[in-house]
Every structure is written in structure tokens, then in C-alpha cells.
């Protein structure tokens, strides 16, 4: 696409759009469709892409809202976030925006739960560390005891080997 646009500009087939800042008012308006290869989107300053009709003259496009069949997980999320009160209340097809909103709300709730659990875990670690300090337990004492045990085992192994 970029190579095509670059070659069009080098051949001076491109034009300065009428809506570009600094464009002179007498810029000739060529049909956009003749400048672009087939299959690529054609945009102009006016209304709809690729047409020279004034904006608003094109027929309105009737858009059918996309419907989505929710999975069991989606249904549980819709219930958990409070969108529906019971599983039977959930219609067979719902808009994807509703599912996205429910998922976002569920993400926020899950984050709040994790924040709460993290704070509770911090207090639990603080309490257990205070109890360990009262018993005079520390990582240093554990490491010294472990190394003393290893030395003792090594000495016993050396005595058994010497016999």
C-alpha cells in the first residue's frame, strides 16, 4: 500500500487534499477512485469514502446489532456482576457490549479481591514473623543449624569411610 502511494506521489498523480492544512483553495478536486488501485480503501475530504457525492446524500446504512450467544462462563459473569438476577433471566442472545462491560466489571472485582487477599497475607506474615522473633527463630539461626548438621553428617561419613 505504501509503495503504491509513494509511486503515485512520485509520478505527481497524487493531490493535496482540500482539507489539508495549508492547501490552496484553488486546488483541483479530482475523482479519488482514479488515483488508487482497485481493492484499497478510498478516502476523501467529503462524505463517504470513494464517492464524490456531498455528505448526507448517501442512503443511511441500517446496522443490525451483533448478537452473541453467551457461554456458561459468560452467564456466570453476568450473574456475578449483577447484570441479571437469575440464570433463567439471561436471554439466549445478548449484545457483545453487554458481555464486555460485565467482563470488565468482573476484572475490577477480581482485582479488588486480590488486593484484599494480599493485604490479609501481609498481616499474616507480619504476625507469624513476630511469633518467630519471640521464639528467637531467624534465618541466620536456621542456616547455622543446617550447616552444623551437614558438618556432623560429613564427619560421620568420614569416620565410616575410615573404618
From Swiss-Prot:
Bias (Basic and acidic residues): 59-69
Keywords (A to Z) from UniProt: Membrane, Transmembrane, Transmembrane helix
Subcellular location: Membrane
Primary site of residence: membrane
Membrane topology: Single-pass membrane protein
Residues spanning the membrane: 110-129
A single GO cellular-component term on record: membrane
Record Pfam families: DUF1075
Keyword Membrane: yes
Span list, region Disordered: 43-69
InterPro entries with a match to the protein in the record: DUF1075 (IPR009432)
The family this protein is said to belong to: Belongs to the UPF0389 family.
The protein, known as: Protein FAM162B
Organism: Bos taurus
Amino acid at each position: 500500500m505504501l509503495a503504491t502511494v509513494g509511486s503515485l506521489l512520485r509520478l505527481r498523480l497524487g493531490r493535496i487534499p482540500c482539507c489539508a492544512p495549508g492547501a490552496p483553495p484553488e486546488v483541483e478536486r479530482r475523482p479519488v477512485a482514479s488515483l488508487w488501485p482497485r481493492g484499497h480503501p478510498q478516502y476523501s475530504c467529503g462524505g463517504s469514502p470513494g464517492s464524490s457525492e456531498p455528505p448526507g446524500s448517501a442512503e443511511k446504512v441500517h446496522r443490525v446489532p451483533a448478537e452473541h450467544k453467551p457461554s456458561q462462563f459468560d452467564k456466570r459473569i453476568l450473574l456475578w456482576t449483577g447484570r441479571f438476577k437469575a440464570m433463567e433471566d439471561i436471554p439466549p442472545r445478548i449484545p457483545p457490549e453487554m458481555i464486555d462491560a460485565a467482563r470488565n466489571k468482573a476484572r475490577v472485582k477480581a482485582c479488588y479481591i486480590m488486593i484484599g487477599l494480599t493485604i490479609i497475607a501481609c498481616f499474616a506474615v507480619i504476625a507469624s514473623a513476630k511469633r518467630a522473633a519471640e521464639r528467637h527463630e531467624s534465618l541466620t539461626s536456621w542456616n547455622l543449624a543446617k550447616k552444623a548438621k551437614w558438618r556432623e553428617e560429613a564427619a560421620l561419613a568420614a569416620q565410616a569411610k575410615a573404618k
